[in-house]
Amino acid sequence: MKKEIAVHELRYSNTNTYLIEGSRGMILFDTGWAGTFRAFCSAMGKLDIPVQKIDFILISHFHPDHMGIAQEIADKGPEIVVMDVQKDYVHAADSVFAKENNDAFISIDDDKVRYVRIEDSRDFLGTIGIDGEIISTPGHSDDSISMWLDSGELFVGDLNPLYELELHKGTQIEKSWNRLLELKPRIVYYGHAKNVDLNSEVPSIKVTDLHKLVARIMKYIDKGVSLDRIQRKTGADETFIEDVTRMYLTHSNIDVQGILDRIEIKGR
C-alpha cells in the first residue's frame, strides 16, 4: 500500500516553508532569509527528521525571503532543483544580501543545481513517490512556480491570495489562479498568508470587505502598529499589507478606493 503524503509546516521565519514526505523521499518547498539556518535546523529537530534526509529543495521564486538559506541547506546533502522557467533568476537576490552585508548568505552553487523542465515535473516528483506536478504561475514574479499534489494540496509561494482576486481581474495573477483552480485544490499553502481549506472556507471576499480590510490596515498604520502585528491582527497576506502601507504613506490624502485601484494596477 502506498504511503500517504505528509505535509509539515516549518515555523522558523517570516516565510512559510513546507516539508513534503513522499513514499520514497522528501522535498522542501521554500526556505527562509539568510541567517535563519540554525532556526531551520531547530524546526527540523522538532520533527525528529535530519536535514540530510531531505532529497530536494524547490524554491517557489528567487526572492531573498524564499531562497536565503537554500545553499546552506544543500551543503548538508539535499539537492536544489530549479525549473527551466527559473534558470535566469537563480541569483536575482544575491545583490540584496550584498547590500545589507549579510555574511550568513551563501550564493547558490550553479554546478550543483539540478535543472528540471516543467513538462518533466511529474516524472521528477515521482522519483520520491509524490504524484503531482510543478506549474509555472507568474504573477507575483516571472519565475514563480507552484507545486500541485494529486491528493489536493497546492503550494503557491507568494502568488497573491485568493481573497485578493477581485483586485486582479484581467491580470496574469488571475490567469495563474484560473489554471490552478481548474485542478480543484483541497488545501492551499501560502508563502505568508494562513493556509486555506477550500472545502470549508470561502476562497475570496467581496469588494466591500476588501474596503473594510484596507481601512482597518490604514488605522493600524496611523497608530504606528508594526507590519508583523498588523498581519497577526488582520490575518491578511504580508505582501498585501506592504502594498497598502506603501500606497498609504507615499500618496497624500489617498482614500481606500485609491489604494485598491493602485494595487490593481500594480498587479497587471
Could you describe each region identified by the protein language model?
Residues 27-29, 58, 80, 153-155, ...:
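Residue-level marker for buried hydrophobic side chains located in beta-strands
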Residues 127:
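A conserved mid-domain beta-alpha-beta active-site/ligand-binding segment of alpha/beta enzyme cores
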Residues 178-187, 194-268:
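Accessory terminal helices/loops
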Residues 1-47, 145-159:
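Conserved beta-strand hairpin/beta-sheet module of binuclear metal-dependent hydrolase folds
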Residues 8-10, 115, 135-138:
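Short Gly/Pro-enriched turn/cap motifs at secondary-structure boundaries
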Residues 34-35, 131-214:
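Metallo-beta-lactamase
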Residues 35-38, 45-124:
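Active-site HxH/HxHxD metal-binding segment of metal-dependent hydrolases
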